[in-house]
């Protein structure tokens, strides 16, 4: 394709001519809002399916997962708002049961695996034979229960049967597992046991719930599939792995020729594939498999871990040798079948991550893009393939642990995904994720997938939120011109060797896609668009190593930044066919690296930065020393300072003299800038003015979960004090559903975080799990209602010897006044504390506080005194509209 090479002369002229557009309080008033998603669902190993029998314009989508996890949504909910159904199904009895017996009467889930519908099948010779009843619970290892062992179902509509088919793995110890098929006329059940599809663990070594160890294979379909009359030597082994798979994690799909396939398996022997019978949804026994080692047909003997095809288990397509890799899922997108796998362990520190391979055929070979010819998804020996100590990188890593700054917690251990092309032609990936600081809690997330120029999948940087563009739009339309693309971006790179055991995660850095086609900032390089498309090419130095230049091919799309309504132009890109770099004569493995970029709306980013920035002084303050100036912007915005008199105070905040000085803070992004003047009196001998802050929770609602709704951070130097003023709003459900003040060494969620205290409003220190140091005169009978809407006036002091004290006066809406204090000594005596508020089922808002405004009258403008808008927020003299100065109101035009 012809590339749109940016005109250097015209764009350089544009650079030189670009003026900054000033914005004031009015321009930023409604620049953005935070968003809360209340329909989150916790379904582990989510498999998504569209109800093809219902509405075509707003169809229902279902997800089923392990342990009978289930939920549904309408497409109009953007795959974020889910609702469970048939709650309580896992209890005793049949109330709300998902399952029925062969007589159509509801049965409890534990009894759903005992009696099958199918009585006859065709064997490996095409002969119709009896299909003996197979009790899947009886096949589980002795002592195993059904509850807790129903893993990772996959659901598909069988067009021939005109039934929904659910493929469920009933796991057992010692590989005594079975994948079975249930059928239903409705996606919500009841599901009836159709029959077994494939089972494992028939080595004759392990006792089952319903069968003895010896001769256990006779109770399976092994003879029907292979014609054997005795247990073949390869299965008669003390160590099932690394030859035999564990029959879990099914994925069922149609190929382009309408054949029905199932992939399955996990660590141990790897991922296998068998063909299914469209007439009954079970295994197609007439489709046979040779015994092959390394792709060569040979006489079967003892177990060989290099076997690539087995007469019973089918064709191996990935993994093997006990190497990590499970949760296979195959989805056709465009030209290729894409094989998704989850490497690593599923816990928060386990390193779970999604890898992708592709093939032009449904049964492979599946390869990645990490070499010019691709690395096969199968392994020939054991090797560690995930985490910081990995010995080999394989498979395109879609993304790893990460956190955009609007996210309350970093995503960790994303995996066991499904994928779908929805009713509007948008490819989506559906996965579960764990989170930093949330133990092993997990939730479902959905991102859009795109195909880049080289035919590799790339994931959109943010959650899917109703975006409409498809791969066809990207390939055939230039949705954005060069002037729209140029600007300030946050970027996240997803390395292979992430220290997942330490729960490390990637955070955004700032880069600038300059109008002349260059890239500056954290990484340097160049960029270009591809004419007539929405593809973007980037060459970046520093992503893989300091000196390596890596080429990326990606896609441009507009998205909504997570947990906000802020629009952002995003890129998602992959280093693939030409991504191998050379540095210092050494060849570096840089293929398969995924990167994300996000160019937030400029005004929203400026406003977000202002809301998240704590200036450690007020206009007119007297300072006997200069606190650290905030210089870190957000969402790609930057903060700079300019002194009116560097001989008194430099731009960097270094005190040089004594007297009055004006410090001007400028927050800028993409041609817009906001400025604010602070007139300060610098006097080393004067009593310092206590700074007053008006903190605001990120989410202004009373439904937020614990450790998700934070204020900005506030720095408190040893020997200093600060004041906080805010209103507290609560759902009044529990005493702890109110503000909590935390003190730590750095921002929550950052590596190396050390917590000193967590003072709850209700007389409790969360960190110490004690009320030691808390003193109050609360009336507990009315406490919960008293706190809702209360005004909090708090002073916090921290001494150089580590002594910390908080005193608060709390005024209720009925004018009752409470006094609350907390004191402690921090043994390590840090030179600075990082303070922040966090709320559960509540929020705080200091932005709406009055600022000493008396009854207003209209008079002429005065040029002295502090300016406030009608919301009580301090503004500068460029503000247009009604303002209050010295308690008087006037209109500034």
Task: For the regions a language model picked out, list residue spans one by one.
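C-terminal outer-membrane/trafficking sorting elements
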Residues: 18, 851-893
């Amino acid at each position: 394709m012809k590339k749109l090479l940016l005109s250097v002369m015209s764009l350089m002229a544009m650079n030189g001519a670009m003026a900054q557009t000033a914005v004031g309080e009015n321009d930023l008033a409604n620049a953005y809002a935070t968003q809360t998603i209340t329909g989150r669902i916790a379904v582990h190993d989510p498999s998504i399916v569209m109800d093809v029998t219902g509405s075509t314009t707003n169809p229902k989508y279902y997800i089923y997962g392990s342990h009978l996890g289930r939920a549904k949504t309408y497409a109009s909910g953007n795959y974020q708002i889910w609702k469970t159904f048939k709650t309580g199904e896992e209890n005793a009895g049949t109330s709300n049961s998902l399952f029925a017996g062969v007589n159509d009467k509801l049965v409890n889930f534990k009894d759903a695996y005992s009696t099958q519908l199918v009585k006859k099948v065709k064997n490996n010779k095409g002969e119709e034979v009896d299909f003996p009843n197979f009790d899947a619970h009886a096949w589980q290892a002795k002592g195993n229960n059904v509850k807790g062992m129903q893993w990772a179902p996959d659901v598909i509509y069988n067009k021939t049967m005109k039934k929904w088919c659910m493929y469920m793995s009933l796991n057992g110890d010692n590989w005594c597992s079975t994948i079975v098929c249930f059928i239903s006329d409705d996606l919500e059940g009841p599901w009836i046991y159709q029959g077994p599809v494939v089972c494992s663990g028939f080595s004759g070594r392990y006792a089952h719930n319903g069968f003895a160890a010896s001769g256990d294979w006779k109770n399976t379909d092994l003879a029907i599939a292979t014609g054997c009359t005795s247990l073949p030597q390869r299965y008669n082994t003390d160590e099932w792995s690394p030859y035999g798979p564990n029959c879990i994690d099914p994925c069922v799909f149609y190929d382009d020729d309408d054949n029905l396939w199932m992939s399955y398996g996990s660590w141990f022997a790897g991922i296998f594939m068998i063909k299914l019978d469209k007439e009954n949804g079970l295994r197609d026994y007439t489709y046979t498999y040779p015994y092959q080692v390394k792709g060569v047909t040979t006489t079967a003997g003892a177990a060989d871990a290099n076997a690539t095809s087995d007469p019973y288990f089918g064709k191996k397509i990935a993994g093997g040798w006990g190497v990590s890799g499970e949760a296979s899922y195959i989805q056709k997108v465009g030209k290729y079948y894409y094989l998704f796998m989850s490497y690593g362990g599923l816990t928060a520190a386990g390193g779970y991550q999604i890898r992708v391979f592709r093939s032009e055929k449904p049964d492979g070979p599946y390869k990645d893009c990490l070499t010019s010819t691709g690395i096969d998804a199968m392994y020939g020996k054991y090797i560690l393939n995930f985490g910081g100590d990995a010995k080999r990188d394989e498979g395109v890593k879609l993304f790893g642990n990460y956190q955009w700054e609007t996210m309350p917690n970093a995503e960790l251990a994303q995996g066991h995904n499904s994928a779908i092309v929805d009713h509007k032609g948008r490819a989506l990936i559906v996965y579960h994720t764990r989170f930093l600081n949330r133990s092993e809690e997990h939730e479902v997330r959905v991102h859009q997938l795109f195909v880049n120029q080289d035919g590799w999948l790339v994931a959109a940087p943010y959650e899917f939120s109703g975006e409409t563009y498809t791969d066809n739009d990207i390939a055939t339309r230039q949705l954005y011109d060069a002037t729209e693309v140029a600007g300030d971006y946050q970027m996240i790179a997803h390395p292979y060797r992430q220290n997942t055991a330490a729960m490390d995660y990637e955070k955004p850095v700032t880069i600038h896609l300059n109008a002349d086609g260059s890239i500056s900032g954290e990484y340097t390089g160049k960029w270009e668009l591809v004419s007539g498309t929405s593809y973007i090419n980037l060459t970046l130095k520093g992503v893989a190593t300091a000196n390596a230049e890596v080429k990326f091919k990606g896609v441009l799309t507009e998205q909504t930044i997570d947990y906000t309504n802020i629009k952002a132009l995003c890129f998602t890109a992959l280093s693939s066919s030409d991504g191998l770099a050379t540095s210092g004569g050494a060849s570096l493995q840089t293929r398969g690296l995924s990167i994300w970029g996000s160019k937030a709306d400029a005004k929203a980013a400026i406003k977000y930065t202002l809301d998240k920035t704590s200036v450690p002084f007020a206009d007119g303050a007297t300072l006997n020393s200069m606190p650290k100036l905030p210089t870190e912007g957000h969402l790609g915005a930057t903060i700079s300072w300019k002194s009116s008199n560097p001989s008194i105070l430099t731009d960097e905040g270094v005190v040089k003299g004594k007297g009055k000085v004006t410090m001007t803070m400028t927050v800028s992004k993409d041609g817009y800038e906001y400025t604010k003047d602070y007139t300060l009196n610098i006097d080393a001998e004067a009593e310092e003015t206590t700074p007053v802050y008006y903190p605001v929770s990120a989410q202004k609602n009373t439904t937020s979960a614990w450790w998700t709704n934070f204020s900005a951070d506030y720095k408190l130097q040893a020997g200093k004090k600060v004041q906080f003023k805010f209103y507290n709003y609560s759902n009044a459900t529990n005493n702890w559903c109110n503000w909590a003040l935390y003190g730590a060494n750095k921002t929550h969620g950052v590596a190396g975080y050390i917590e000193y205290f967590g003072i709850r409003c209700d007389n409790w220190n969360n960190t110490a799990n004690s009320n030691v140091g808390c003193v109050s005169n609360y009336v507990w009978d009315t406490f919960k209602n008293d706190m809702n809407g209360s005004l909090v006036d708090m002073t916090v002091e921290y001494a150089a010897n580590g002594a910390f004290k908080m005193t608060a006066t709390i005024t209720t809406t009925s004018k009752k006044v409470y006094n609350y204090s907390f004191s402690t000594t921090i043994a390590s005596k840090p030179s600075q504390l990082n303070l922040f508020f966090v709320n559960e089922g509540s929020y705080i808002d200091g932005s709406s506080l009055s600022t000493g405004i008396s009854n207003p009258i209209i008079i002429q403008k005065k040029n002295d005194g502090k300016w406030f808008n009608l919301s009580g927020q301090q503004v500068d003299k460029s503000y247009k509209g009604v303002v209050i100065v010295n308690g008087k109101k006037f209109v500034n035009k």
